[in-house]
């Protein structure tokens, strides 16, 4: 089968011919329809320091997808041939304390699809049936293919009660924009998103965010005054991994504010901890999606009218995969979809 693989320990990704993965007793064989390029895939493409430490070569990469079930393991129940599915990209052990306690998203032995085991940038993918999620009929293939990053956004945004709250989102990447859209959809009062990339900020404006702020040109305190905010943000969603953005968030949070952090800093990050202490801030780290509560909420949000379509900006055939990676690497894109049909 055709597959996009990290074939060499250098920048790039290559179209390869690899065997169709073998189906285990508890697995599903999925024929891939569409995949989306993640920021993680860009790290792997660029072969940065994290990738060099993490990715075995050769490796079929990718973990954002939608497809249909074409093979079912002997022990699998609840699925049938032809089911349209996406899937949780974190394969958990099932044996650690968190897994046995129902907190599988906190499994300390997590294996990543397309990172530690063969991924979805291929004609076929095998995953445990436990990890598959059936896609409702009224959700398109394009939207289903970005459920993985959408899940990061939903998990982050819905960590706290947002109804009537003022929310600051730092980082207008696709996940940050989707998190801001979720916050607005579920009843936040003001949702402000910050970045220095004007293309991405314009995408956020198309999604109906209260204010998209280029912090290289505007002062966040002025924006808060313009919105009639007198006490600071109630909830912060840190999606950028940029230390200056997090420090600004700490400066502008209200006392008793709550922060969910998904963005990963490039290295050790120093902050003024007295602001955390004296403001009584609550900080929560976010990794992946809750299995599978986040997935059900994702589907329900779209079915209840949340429109994510503006976040998908580029679509290519898999034969034009290089154009897709070029678009992602440029910073002038939202989500990029690759079609395998």
Curated annotation (Swiss-Prot):
The active site is at 40 (charge relay system), 43 (charge relay system). Gene3D superfamilies: Medium-chain alcohol dehydrogenases, catalytic domain (3.90.180.10), NAD(P)-binding Rossmann-like Domain (3.40.50.720). Zn(2+) 1 binds at residues 38, 63-64. The record marks 148 as: Important for catalytic activity for the proton relay mechanism but does not participate directly in the coordination of zinc atom. Zn(2+) 2 binds at residues 93, 96, 99, 107. NAD(+) binds at residues 175, 195, 200, 262-264, 286-287. It catalyses: L-threonine + NAD(+) = (2S)-2-amino-3-oxobutanoate + NADH + H(+). Keywords: Cytoplasm, Metal-binding, NAD, Oxidoreductase, Zinc. Pathway: Amino-acid degradation; L-threonine degradation via oxydo-reductase pathway; glycine from L-threonine: step 1/2. Its cofactor is Zn(2+). Binds 2 Zn(2+) ions per subunit. It is found in: Cytoplasm. Homotetramer. This is L-threonine 3-dehydrogenase. It comes from Escherichia coli O157:H7.
């Amino acid at each position: 089968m055709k597959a996009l693989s990290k074939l060499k320990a250098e920048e790039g990704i290559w179209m390869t011919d690899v065997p169709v993965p073998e189906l285990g007793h508890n697995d599903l064989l999925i024929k891939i329809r569409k995949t989306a390029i993640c920021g993680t895939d860009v790290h792997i493409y660029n072969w940065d320091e994290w990738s060099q430490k993490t990715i075995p070569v050769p490796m079929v990469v990718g973990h954002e997808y939608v497809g249909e079930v074409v093979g079912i393991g002997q022990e699998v129940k609840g699925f049938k041939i032809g089911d349209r599915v996406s899937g949780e990209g974190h394969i958990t052990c099932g044996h650690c304390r968190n897994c046995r306690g129902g907190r599988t998203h906190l499994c300390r032995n997590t294996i990543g699809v397309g990172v530690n085991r063969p991924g979805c940038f291929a004609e076929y993918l095998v995953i445990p049936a436990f990890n598959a999620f059936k896609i409702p009929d009224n959700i398109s293939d394009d939207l289903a293919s970005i459920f993985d990053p959408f899940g990061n956004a939903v998990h982050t945004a819905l960590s706290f009660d947002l109804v009537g709250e003022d929310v600051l989102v730092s980082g207008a990447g696709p996940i940050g924009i989707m998190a801001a859209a979720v916050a607005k959809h579920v009843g936040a009062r003001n949702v402000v998103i910050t970045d220095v990339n004007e293309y991405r900020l314009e995408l956020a404006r198309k999604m109906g965010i209260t204010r998209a702020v280029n912090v290289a040109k505007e002062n966040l305190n002025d924006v808060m005054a313009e919105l009639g905010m007198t006490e600071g943000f109630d909830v912060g969603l840190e999606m950028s991994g940029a230390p200056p953005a997090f420090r600004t968030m700490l400066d502008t949070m209200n006392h008793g504010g709550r922060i969910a952090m998904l963005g990963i800093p490039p290295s050790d990050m120093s902050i003024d901890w007295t602001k955390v202490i004296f403001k009584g801030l609550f900080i929560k780290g976010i990794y992946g999606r809750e299995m599978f509560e986040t997935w059900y909420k994702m589907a329900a949000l779209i079915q209840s009218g949340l429109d994510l379509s503006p976040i998908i900006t580029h679509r290519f055939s898999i034969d034009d995969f290089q154009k897709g990676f070029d678009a992602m690497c440029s910073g002038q894109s939202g989500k990029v979809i690759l079609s395998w049909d």
